[in-house]
């Protein structure tokens, strides 16, 4: 395309074209080519541009495309030069009247370059000529009037500047010397103001149409992210994750650590900041908007971490070290001292929890999540013997099956407990002590890492963990449950006989259903990191999982085998660690709650999706059969569990209705009637705060290998019958009161029978996966691990508040009960399930439960957080560099006042000559640790300097060193960075004197002053110096200090060589031999010791290549020559050559001139 540039010439009124041409002809010779004044430079640049435009108009570009392309490139370069000089003139003439260009902060960094003005001019001329931007015809049409105004205004400015060149030019004048009273100067001033305003408007519109420009809202969001980075850095400095030295030295590792830590801080600590994922997506910065869903999942998992785990994750993100499971276990073991495996009080539980505040979840501090894994052992109901004294909390004498509740995820246990747990014996209730969260996590680690629980299904001596009769039951509301003890005894007996007959008929069906339910195993974790990609790291259960995290049938059988083979001592030790903080309420009440939580939970998921389901519809509690193992050696359990006739009828009919849980009510025909809840009722923990604190269940296991336990297994049927009668009396009372309180715990056997009855009822109706086995099956039981997610809240209200809350919630449950198809409800927490906070807790628990161990969870979070943070380095590199540069400036240590040096003798003269050297103002290191160059303390260069310089990393970690004086702030920074690169030492070189002269001059040379300055040397130099010193020490000659630098002539093309050490010698006492020895030493060491490399020219002082004068751009980067220190483009410095004189034995980058020079040498 041929670009036609119309140059309109306008003249002042009264000036004819002939006179102007004559003036040009007269003054043309006065502009010398070397004139550096602004007007002279503008005149030559404008004249060259006019010539190129004329040549372009003289031929058809389509006929000669190569020539046209070459001339267009020259045209754009000429436009850049003209506009650059025009900007300098406007800066001098307009000053503060220039148009504001604050909008440039919204531009991408790659747009802001020196050729931007020329591109804008070229685009304005194309638009004014009728062209359009590709695929942006609408924007082009809107910009065309403004483009025409810009080109017209620019031509007016060019004409008036040419006129001023002929009128008021002063050769080599650093400033403009225009006649202020002249009308032409005033017109020029106004023309420049108009052009500046129009050009700024066109710049904003044109760049916005070509590239994506940040809006005002996005810019403010990035400012908030910058503040988040700064707050994160300050927090990391306080917690010891980072060091102030790293900030002061601009450690490049912080460019990765700060964004990673900021993601955690924004999601967990500063929740209302820019990373608040609860706000709409439009209010989130575009930096994190693509990762919104992933960040939400990461936030949920981070809230489930304890403070210790969170600190370990942050440390891992800073150091990139491997996750050590032993360190986690050490933290867990420390928490063991706070929990007592024996008996304790509720106050001890609360104190134990407060003691480990550091292990609390980082989410809500007052609401914790407990994952309970229950091992159920079900056996045939061959009841023998009579257990005397079975009046306390329900144990194996009245329990229908043995349940071992294991806290498998230590998210938190309930605090503020006032009662004791319901783990009881035949003698009475027992009070369990607090079990700290570290202990729970310890159990969880063993359960998940070893693939089997650390307990056994064998029996143990219950007296070891019973506390006797010191627990007083808490009687809440129902005081009439002890009435009507003998009223329905005969009905219960009849029901028992009928149910035992029915169990034999349903045994085969139950086994088949259970095996079918165990075919689909539970997923215990997510993906293996090496076998997945970034997108599915936190994927939910809907996607297929990696096989190594899925529990197979073999693992399930191994799990049951290890459960059956563990010793009783291990079981007792684990039971002590299982019992969590005791909450208010008696044992019977808690047992009833736990049975309902474990049995009445969401049993309609045979595939056990609870561990990975992250959807909001996730129920807050699910019971999933994870393993099953026949156990023929288990002793028969109590067979005094009543089963109802409607239950038998329903199980015979084979109804396939899928239900959440069945509900128990009392009918008019002396037996209980069960119905199916058609509503998808979410089963949560109790609504009562007191009962919700009683989360961790009881331990009831049996085995015929323990005689003591077997005697208790054969409990008295009569006591069970009475407890059932009490349970019915309690239900009648609740039915007449129009609300459904918990049965009173004044009699623990009542709750035992009630639980047994409900358990039997529930197991018959949970036919979806039938984790219950009929009590009538012959000596063959099933051991199943049941993972139950429950939630518990801290009990912060007093008794009356809890009572009032319970009354209201039970009233709501009663209203729901009358509207539903069920006759009654066993879990009065349906109204509370709608609470969003409870659902969130359950979601977090389910999210964490899908990981095998804490190590796996931390590793997954590390990969995701590091992936998001590192992706920002690619997608928003320029914005991230700007923000990190601001963070470094804000958080760097204030500059310390320079201490005046205290030199003496020749040292003072040498150092003074060095410190006064102008080249010491700048010092640049050839190291990858240069994030922000040191000269930015005095210069406002762009952040691209460090990017261009970062490529010049010396493979041998060579460094450029300057003076050793402490007064330079650059030297202080260099010494901070010198941990892995340099060693700042004063090298003492031992040199042997000539033969015959070394012994005589030895004493004087030891006491003599230094002949050269002390300087810092790199590692390679230090090795050479030490080797040279050892070699010369064998000669027995005298010693003296010598500088590591050679003479002045050895530096070649170096522009900053210090004074020669020979010339700086003093007459402090050495005589002629001493002086001659110095000369000899300098020549000897010159061959072995490397010279000082030349100082690099600062990037901001080299806008163009020093060889071809090409301007540097983001694509034409700066490269320093290691031999001369000059700045060149990649074409002019594409050669490499070893430089032994500088200690560089490997090939390094050199410019072409130095390459020719070195090869010639």
Swiss-Prot record:
What positions does the entry give for Zn(2+) 1 binding? Answer: 1105, 1108, 1129, 1132
Q: Where is the composition biased (Polar residues)?
A: 935-948, 956-967
UniProt name for this protein: Lateral signaling target protein 2 homolog
Q: Please, which domain of life does this record's source organism belong to?
A: Eukaryota
Which molecular function GO terms apply here? Answer: zinc ion binding
Q: Which CDD domains match?
A: FYVE_LST2
Which Gene3D superfamilies does the record match to this protein?
Zinc/RING finger domain, C3HC4 (zinc finger)
């Amino acid at each position: 395309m041929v670009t036609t540039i119309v140059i309109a010439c306008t003249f002042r009124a009264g000036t004819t074209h002939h006179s102007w041409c004559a003036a040009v002809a007269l003054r043309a010779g006065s502009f010398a080519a070397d004139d550096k004044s602004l007007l002279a430079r503008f005149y030559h640049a404008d004249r060259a541009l006019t010539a190129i435009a004329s040549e372009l108009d003289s031929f058809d570009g389509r006929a000669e495309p190569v020539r046209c392309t070459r001339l267009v490139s020259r045209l754009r370069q000429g436009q850049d030069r003209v506009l650059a000089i025009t900007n300098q003139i406007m800066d001098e003439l307009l000053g503060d009247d220039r148009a504001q260009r604050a909008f440039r902060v919204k531009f991408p960094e790659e747009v802001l370059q020196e050729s931007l003005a020329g591109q804008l001019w070229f685009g304005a001329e194309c638009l004014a000529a009728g062209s359009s931007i590709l695929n942006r015809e609408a924007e082009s049409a809107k910009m065309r009037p403004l483009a025409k105004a810009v080109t017209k205004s620019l031509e007016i400015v060019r004409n008036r500047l040419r006129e001023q060149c002929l009128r008021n030019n002063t050769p080599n004048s650093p400033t403009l010397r225009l006649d202020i009273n002249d009308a032409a100067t005033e017109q020029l001033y106004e023309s420049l103001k108009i052009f500046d305003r129009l050009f700024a408007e066109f710049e904003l519109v044109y760049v916005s149409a070509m590239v994506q420009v940040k809006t005002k809202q996005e810019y403010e969001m990035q400012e908030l992210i910058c503040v988040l980075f700064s707050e994160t850095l300050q927090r990391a400095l306080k917690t010891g994750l980072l060091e102030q030295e790293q900030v002061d030295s601009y450690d490049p590792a912080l460019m990765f650590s700060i964004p990673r830590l900021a993601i955690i801080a924004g999601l967990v600590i500063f929740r209302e900041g820019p990373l608040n994922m609860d706000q709409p997506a439009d209010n989130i910065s575009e930096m994190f908007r693509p990762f919104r869903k992933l960040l939400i999942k990461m936030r949920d998992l981070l809230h489930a971490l304890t403070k210790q785990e969170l600190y370990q994750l942050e440390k891992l993100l800073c150091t990139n070290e491997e996750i050590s499971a032993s360190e986690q276990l050490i933290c867990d073991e420390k928490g063991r001292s706070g929990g007592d495996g024996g008996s304790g009080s509720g106050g001890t539980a609360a104190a134990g929890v407060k003691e480990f505040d550091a292990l609390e979840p980082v989410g809500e501090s007052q609401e914790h999540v407990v994952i309970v894994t229950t091992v159920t052992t079900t056996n045939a109901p061959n009841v023998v013997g009579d257990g005397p004294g079975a009046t306390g909390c329900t144990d194996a004498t009245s329990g229908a099956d043995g349940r071992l509740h294991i806290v498998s995820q230590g998210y938190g246990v309930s605090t503020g407990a006032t009662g004791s747990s319901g783990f009881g014996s035949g003698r009475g209730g027992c009070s369990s002590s607090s079990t700290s969260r570290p202990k729970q996590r310890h159990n969880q680690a063993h359960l998940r890492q070893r693939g089997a629980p650390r307990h056994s299904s064998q029996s143990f001596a219950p007296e070891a963990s019973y506390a006797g009769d010191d627990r007083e039951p808490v009687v809440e509301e129902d005081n009439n449950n002890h009435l009507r003890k003998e009223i329905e005894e005969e009905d219960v007996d009849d029901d028992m006989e009928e149910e035992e007959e029915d169990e034999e008929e349903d045994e085969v069906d139950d086994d088949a259903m259970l095996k079918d339910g165990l075919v689909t195993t539970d997923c215990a974790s997510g993906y293996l990191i090496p076998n997945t990609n970034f997108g599915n790291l936190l994927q939910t259960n809907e996607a297929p999982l990696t096989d190594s995290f899925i529990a197979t049938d073999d693992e399930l059988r191994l799990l049951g085998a290890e459960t059956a083979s563990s010793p009783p001592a291990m079981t007792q030790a684990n039971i002590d660690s299982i019992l969590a903080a005791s909450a208010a309420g008696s044992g019977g009440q808690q047992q009833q709650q736990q049975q309902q939580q474990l049995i009445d939970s969401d049993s309609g998921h045979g595939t056990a999706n609870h561990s990975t389901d992250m959807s909001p519809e996730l129920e807050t509690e699910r019971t999933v059969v994870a393993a099953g193992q026949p156990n023929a050696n288990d002793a028969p359990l109590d067979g005094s569990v009543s089963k109802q006739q409607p239950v038998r009828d329903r199980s015979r009919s084979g109804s396939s209705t899928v239900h959440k849980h069945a509900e128990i009510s009392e009918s008019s025909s002396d037996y209980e009637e069960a119905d199916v809840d058609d509503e998808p009722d979410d089963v949560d923990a109790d609504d009562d705060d007191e009962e919700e604190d009683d989360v961790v269940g009881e331990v009831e296991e049996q085995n015929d290998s323990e005689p003591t336990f077997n005697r208790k297994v054969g409990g008295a049927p009569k006591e069970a019958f009475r407890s059932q009668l009490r349970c019915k009396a309690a239900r009648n009372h609740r039915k007449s009161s129009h609300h459904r309180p918990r049965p009173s715990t004044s009699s623990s056997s009542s709750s035992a029978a009630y639980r047994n009855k409900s358990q039997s009822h529930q197991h018959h109706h949970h036919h979806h996966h039938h984790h219950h086995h009929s009590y009538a099956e012959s000596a063959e039981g099933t051991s199943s691990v049941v993972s139950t997610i429950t939630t518990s809240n801290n009990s912060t209200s007093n008794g009356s508040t809890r009572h009032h809350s319970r009354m209201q919630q039970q009233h709501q449950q009663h209203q729901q009960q009358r509207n539903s198809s069920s006759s009654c409800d066993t879990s009065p927490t349906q109204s509370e399930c709608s609470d969003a906070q409870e659902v969130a807790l359950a979601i977090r628990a389910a999210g964490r439960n899908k990981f095998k161990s804490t190590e796996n969870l931390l590793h997954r979070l590390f990969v995701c957080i590091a992936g998001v943070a590192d992706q920002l380095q690619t997608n928003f590199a320029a914005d991230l560099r700007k923000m990190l540069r601001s963070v470094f400036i804000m958080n760097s240590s204030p500059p310390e006042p320079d201490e005046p040096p205290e030199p003496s003798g020749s040292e003072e003269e040498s150092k003074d000559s060095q410190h006064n050297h102008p080249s010491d103002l700048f010092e640049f290191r050839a190291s990858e640790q240069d994030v922000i160059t040191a000269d930015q303390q005095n210069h406002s260069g762009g952040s691209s300097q460090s990017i261009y310089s970062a490529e010049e990393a010396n493979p041998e970690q060579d460094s450029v060193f300057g003076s050793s004086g402490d007064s330079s702030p650059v030297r202080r920074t260099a010494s901070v960075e010198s941990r892995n690169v340099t060693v700042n030492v004063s090298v003492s070189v031992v040199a042997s004197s000539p033969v015959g002269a070394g012994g005589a001059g030895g004493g004087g040379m030891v006491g003599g002053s230094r002949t050269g300055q002390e300087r810092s040397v790199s590692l390679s130099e230090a090795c050479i110096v030490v080797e040279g010193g050892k070699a010369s020490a064998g000669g027995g000659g005298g010693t003296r200090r010598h500088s590591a630098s050679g003479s002045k002539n050895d530096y070649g093309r170096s522009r900053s060589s210090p004074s020669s050490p020979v010339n700086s010698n003093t007459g402090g006492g050495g005589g002629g031999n001493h002086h001659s020895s110095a000369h000899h030493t300098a020549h000897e060491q010159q061959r072995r010791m490397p010279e000082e490399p030349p100082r690099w020219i600062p990037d901001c002082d080299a806008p163009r290549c020093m060889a071809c004068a090409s301007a540097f751009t983001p694509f034409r980067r700066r490269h320093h020559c290691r031999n001369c220190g000059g700045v060149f483009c990649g074409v002019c410095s594409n050669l490499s050559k070893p430089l032994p004189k500088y200690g560089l034995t490997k090939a390094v980058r050199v410019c072409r001139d130095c390459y020719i020079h070195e090869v010639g040498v």
